Amino acid sequence: MNKDFNEFKKFIYNKKVAIIGLGISNMPLVEFLSNLGARVTGFDKKNENELENNINELKAKGVNFELGENYLDKLSNFDVVFRTPSMRTDHPILIKAKSEGAYITSEMEEFIKYCPAKLFCITGSDGKTTTTTLIYNILKTEGYTVWVGGNIGNPLFTKIEEIKKDDKVVLELSSFQLMSIKEPIEVALVTNVSPNHLDIHKDMEEYIKAKKNIFKYQRENDLLVINEDNKITKSMEEECRGRLLKFSMKEKLKEGSFYYNEDLYINEKKVCNVSEVKLKGMHNVENLLAAFSCVSEDSSIDSMREVAKNFNGVEHRLEFVKEIQEVKYFNDSIASSPTRTLAALQSFDRPVILIAGGYDKKISFEVLAKEGISHIKHLILLGDTKYKIEEAFKKVMRDSSEDLPISICNSIEEAINIAKENGESGDVVTLSPACASFDMFKNFEERGNKFKSIIRNL
């Protein structure tokens, strides 16, 4: 049983509150906390003209703002500080605020602490969003009122008084959000772990440690779901504090979900055949298995089967865009890691024309090159990592008999033109960057929408 939200309302009233970062989750938080009687100041590196939201109404309500290049200079003597998820917990300004007596927290920490409904929380390096959405859809099909949030959906803390005890809440959580989570989570899922976000985390060890926070504070009756086939997640079994279920594409399991002889099972009961699954790619079969284990105590097999047969995917995840002169174009902009792009390549029955590259998260492309080269007909690279990816593939070509045409370009428009010029009847072109988008775009959605807009106008 989580804490009563009335406790938070009493706690926050008349407190001097700093909210760092005025993005999607924190902007509604500013108004919400102000309405609860907090004395709020919003901090953001952007100036007022660059903010996506108009702040004049909030100013009229007494909210203060510190904006622009030196926005953190006046963050001093606050009672409570809400950090933005991308801000490290050991940032000097947070250490200073804590030494002054401030309570450091985040929107997600407070939501998990006070959420009245059963929580299903999902983390991992790949497959988080699709699996989160699958869990949401299965629970909804079962007849529950379901809320979805975290990295997808809407900020939920401001809706907390609308959420009922019998509802279900599904959260996609990043390693950044998990770094400071110290609350028990009823159902925790780790889809898989591979190198990622090493531009933010000090090393792989810190990244894994953050992921483990999803189950570190679980109680005896809480449930942890892990991937039996992933070396890192399998090792987490030793640290499980509650009950454990697994999912596997390789092994038959007495408890949990598995894939065997082209059928998907949960607790040794068949859900459906792989031919009935609407989602493209075996990595999505794995995502379904993860979802089945998570909802096995709250859902019927009928609801699992219905979603498996009818769910056709999430925007920007191997999303079919258009067929032009017998060449099919797919948008996989969500693929911000090499493992995700490799999974996308393996989903097609022929080598594809791949558009890749983007923001450098300081991770290796060696495995993508070694295992992906045979799945690529033509590699088109752009963004900060274009030469880094090119070198990884050239090394594979030097060490083997493989050969692959590689084109380097400076914009997504140029990349699409090269793809169009080289595409032949029956070919597949996919944007699956293997990198984050921040070098050229605001986020992966903007990158994907730009790609789709250009393709639809060809």
From Swiss-Prot:
Cited SUPFAM superfamilies: MurCD N-terminal domain, MurD-like peptide ligases, catalytic domain, MurD-like peptide ligases, peptide-binding domain
Binding site for ATP: G124, S125, D126, G127, K128, T129, T130
Primary location: cytoplasm
GO molecular function: ATP binding; UDP-N-acetylmuramoylalanine-D-glutamate ligase activity
CC per GO annotation: cytoplasm
InterPro entries registered for this protein in UniProt: Mur-like_cat_sf, Mur_ligase_C, Mur_ligase_C_dom_sf, Mur_ligase_cen, MurD
Function: Cell wall formation. Catalyzes the addition of glutamate to the nucleotide precursor UDP-N-acetylmuramoyl-L-alanine (UMA).
Protein name: UDP-N-acetylmuramoylalanine--D-glutamate ligase
Species whose genome carries this gene: Clostridium tetani (strain Massachusetts / E88)
Gene name, Swiss-Prot/TrEMBL: murD
